[in-house]
Regions:
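C-terminal peripheral helix-coil segments that are non-catalytic and often amphipathic
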Residues: 1-6, 141-149, 153, 175-228, ...
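Generic hydrophobic, amphipathic alpha-helix propensity
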Residues: 18-27, 43, 68-72, 76, ...
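Helix-turn-helix
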Residues: 21, 29-63, 67, 229, ...
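Hydrophobic alpha-helical connector segments
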Residues: 67, 81-110, 159, 271, ...
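Amphipathic alpha-helical packing segments from all-alpha helical-bundle domains
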Residues: 77, 124-151, 160-164, 171, ...
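Amphipathic alpha-helical segments used for helix-helix packing
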Residues: 92, 101-130, 144, 309-328, ...
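Short, well-structured alpha-helical segments
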Residues: 94, 156-167, 299, 303, ...
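An extended, acidic
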Residues: 302-303, 313-335, 339, 346, ...
Length: 411
């Protein structure tokens, strides 16, 4: 006969294995549909259970989403602990990137499941939301510590910008890495690390951007203010978290007025994306018509978009809203994003030929630039603690000159 302890141990292992399977299925559902869009029925179907069986492990859908997010935070924490074992900031960043790339290779080969993306954290309800955001802030601080303790407030601010750009670039990998064969991942990793190590500007190229005269108006009166308010809410609460009622109340209009502008909520997020992509493309076009080197055109584009993100005119819509969209619409939005990235790649290629930009992989570097300008919205509070020009220079320096270059501190 089995000893009682062995039976209990076996039961605990079975319980844990089933719980882990439910969490993995929940992560897939969150990544496809967002936390708000995830249902018990869908998660149950993915693991071959009925809905009642799932509630044995997690009483409420919110509990399941929170557990999936906590698992992600735990994995990020462990990855950072491993990276922190290295002796220098550069070695730590290289190790952290390598851990991420190897994890994504295992996922691509089917050897591992992905964890839940964290874009819906702010759409959760308190007290769970407070606990999760505290966990996220701890991850941010630990990432910042890859560069050690800042000797001054300015150094801490710069390390914070570097941490954010590193995290966002590793999160953004899932959007563009599938365009490569899995056996190319080591080469892509090396090329991205080159950008992190030395930046995109060639030696001797200074940071002297000219802010471009970026003016964007929607053809219909009132639509620009409407889309701007919707973009802010969707960035803060996620696509599913920003209800039509909430957007309407933010603008102090009725739900009927909302439907005067757009027929459905999917149309709203598509319109917000179109507005954001149009603004980025406008900046690229304006820069290309300017005098100066290709680096000067690129640094003006980056500075203009970051200034826009940090100002009251912004933000641009975060790509995190993609997880709430129907697959076909999401694919269309990613295609537009990739066209914009290819335009950045063209600017980089011209600069490489000219000698004003380092000999880097322009396709890889262009996606790093997409992550940089896309994620800047989250750093608005950080940027508000210093002059705008300084915030833009600090944040842009992370890719202009790399994650280990301190010249922005002397500016």
């Amino acid at each position: 006969m089995n000893a009682p302890g062995n039976i209990a141990s076996g039961g605990t292992k079975r319980f844990q294995a089933k719980r882990d399977a439910i969490l993995a299925a929940a992560a897939d559902a969150i990544n496809e549909q967002s936390a708000k869009g995830m249902t018990f029925a869908d998660v149950a179907r993915r693991v071959g259970l009925n809905t009642t069986s799932v509630t044995y492990y997690f009483k409420r859908k919110e509990d399941l989403a929170a557990a999936a997010f906590e698992q992600t935070l735990g994995q990020l924490d462990a990855m950072l602990d491993t990276a922190l074992e290295e002796a220098t900031p550069e070695a730590r960043v290289a190790r952290y990137l390598n851990i991420n790339m190897e994890r994504l290779a295992r996922i691509r080969r089917g050897d591992e499941r992905d964890f839940a993306i964290l874009s819906d954290l702010r759409a959760m309800e308190d007290p769970v939301k407070g606990r999760l955001l505290t966990g996220w802030r701890n991850i941010f601080r630990k990432t910042r510590s890859l560069w050690g303790a800042g000797a001054s407030r300015a150094e801490t601010d710069l390390f914070g910008a570097r941490a954010h750009v590193l995290l966002e670039n590793t999160f953004w990998l899932t959007a563009w890495l599938p365009r490569y064969e899995v056996d190319e991942y080591p080469r892509v990793e090396a090329r991205l690390m080159e950008v992190f190590r030395s930046g995109i500007a060639a030696p001797g190229q200074d940071w002297r951007p000219e802010l471009l005269d970026l003016v964007h108006e929607e053809p219909e009166p009132g639509r620009e203010a409407f889309l701007l308010a919707a973009t802010r809410l969707i960035n803060e609460l996620g696509y599913r978290g920003a209800s039509v009622q909430r957007i309407a109340s933010e603008l102090n209009v009725t739900k009927g007025s909302f439907y005067h502008h757009l027929d459905a909520k999917d149309e709203l997020v598509i319109a917000c994306y179109k507005r954001s992509f149009d603004i980025i493309a406008d900046a690229q076009r304006l820069a290309e018509s300017h005098e100066g080197s290709h680096w000067q055109r690129l640094d003006s584009t980056i500075a203009t978009l970051l200034d826009y993100q940090f100002s009251e005119r912004g933000p641009l819509l975060r790509t995190t809203a993609l997880s709430g969209l129907p697959p076909q619409v999401r694919s269309t939005m990613i295609d537009r994003s990739n066209r914009i990235a290819r335009r950045f790649a063209g600017m980089l290629s011209d600069g490489i030929a000219e000698g004003s930009i380092r000999a880097i992989d322009p396709l890889v570097a262009s996606q790093a630039l997409m992550a940089l300008q896309n994620a800047a919205f989250d750093m608005r509070k950080w940027a508000s603690t210093m002059p705008r020009e300084k915030a833009v220079a600090f944040y842009a320096s992370t890719l202009a000159y790399g994650l280990f270059d301190d010249r922005a501190l002397k500016g």
